[in-house]
Amino acid sequence: MILPGSVTGSDRWYKSKYMDAMAICCRMGRPHLFVTMTCNPKWPEITAQLKKGQTHNDRPDIVSRVFKQKLAELMKDFKGGQFGEYAGHVHSIEFQKSGLPHAHIIFWMADKDAWRKTETVDKVISAEIPDESSRRSYYIYVAWTMW
């Protein structure tokens, strides 16, 4: 059976979305950032809504809603200029085998050369655990979400 491109998830739908993304790449050039956002089942917004004995697997509606809201906030930060002047993006949301959503996002920024500079990247990317004595609340949160 051949399904039309208007049916979400069909082969023609995927091909259409792929062609749209390629057209954007042709117009905008190479993307500047590739961001992956993964849902964390320990987010307080999720755990606060679960009843005693429930896990995130029991409430995929809550997990999806919280993830979508956090993704919307991330997009608002990019579009608002938190990471430089925004020019465009393409994203895809998938569900892992564990049932948790994650998004793959490519961004184009208006200043095409800014993201080639180490200083620009270092301003927004941090890969260190906060100091336990001077930034205790950040340390606790990072340690809690890591394990």
Protein language model annotation of sequence segments:
Residues 1-147:
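Extended, structured polyanion-binding interfaces
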